[in-house]
UniProtKB/Swiss-Prot annotation:
Consequences of knocking out this gene: Morpholino knockdown of the protein causes impaired mitophagy.
Organism: Danio rerio
Keyword field: Autophagy, Mitochondrion, Transit peptide
Protein name, UniProt field: Protein NipSnap homolog 1
GO molecular function, one term: protein-macromolecule adaptor activity
Length: 279
């Protein structure tokens, strides 16, 4: 009986000691938020507090471009007619110098939400350019007729106003036959700057095959949303390019620190529409 009691007593003593150590570490961690001990390393990497809006800290200073992304869910029986009508109207707006806007890209979703069109517009001059463009469109009888006709074809639509990350290249027209992937991330509120800090270092791992098209974050619409736009020759090329990134030292660290910042993520594989500057 005595032989059994002594090991149990020893185990209880060891457990009591470990509990005290753990309690001390926890107290220390919560009492001193600036201390980066072992507990804080279990969570997202900390960044310094900022005293400015993330739109000023993360966007490009030398340009004042504003972007708008549109998601149109089309009635299946109208998909072909919708594409043809959009092609005609967007082409005119894109080439009309009287309107301070241009189509960056237009796509149909291939994998993801079906019977969907995605349009990305750029407004050179920021919010004043957007306001001026909308004012002129509301006076354009041809556009108003298009909008009325288009409304019959849609199930729903939504849009977001975006700024581009300073460390991404600005989207430029592409020739050839490509597929595009739009990866959208809903971040935890307050983590946009941290996301930008990590991706500013990580983007170098994803540029060797010219796959990086553009990176954006929302200003109006769904907030704390990030969109990364990628181009690949085909799905097999996408698979090989993404796999190659994991072989580069440092990419895994970037993924490790950005994953805890994400609430939700979504991937769309998209096919360019006929008039899209990004082909």
């Amino acid at each position: 009986m005595m032989a059994t009691a002594r090991p149990l007593q020893l185990l209880n003593t060891q457990q009591h000691f470990l509990n005290n150590v753990l309690a001390a570490w926890l107290a220390r961690g919560f009492a001193n938020k600036s201390d980066e001990g072992w507990l804080s390393s279990m969570f997202a990497h900390k960044v310094d507090a900022r005293k400015d809006a993330h739109s000023n800290l993360l966007s490009k200073k030398e340009t004042s471009n504003l972007y708008k992304i549109q998601f149109h869910n089309v009635k299946p029986e109208y998909m072909e007619e919708y594409n043809k009508l959009s092609d005609e109207v967007q082409k005119e707006l894109h080439h009309d110098t009287d309107y301070p806007c241009e189509v960056v890209g237009s796509w149909n979703t291939w994998y993801g939400e079906q019977d969907q069109a995605v349009h990305l517009w750029r407004y050179s001059g920021g919010y004043p350019a957007l306001t001026e463009c909308l004012r002129k469109l509301n006076l354009n009888t041809a556009y108003l007729a298009f909008r009325k006709e288009r409304s019959k074809m849609l199930l729903s639509r939504r849009n977001q106003l975006l700024l581009e990350f300073s460390f991404w290249n600005e989207p430029v027209p592409r020739s050839g036959s490509n597929i595009y992937e739009l990866r959208s991330y809903q971040l935890l509120p307050g983590t946009m700057i941290e996301w930008g800090n990590h991706w500013a270092r990580a983007i170098k791992y994803r540029q060797e095959n010219n796959e990086a098209v553009g990176g954006f974050f929302t200003q109006i619409g769904d907030l704390y949303v990030v969109h990364h736009l990628w181009a690949y020759k085909d799905l097999q090329s996408r698979e090989e390019t993404r796999k190659a990134a994991w072989e580069k030292e440092g990419w895994d660290v970037s993924v490790h620190y950005t994953m805890p910042l994400i609430q939700k993520m979504e991937s769309r594989i998209m096919i360019p529409m006929v008039h899209s500057p990004l082909q």
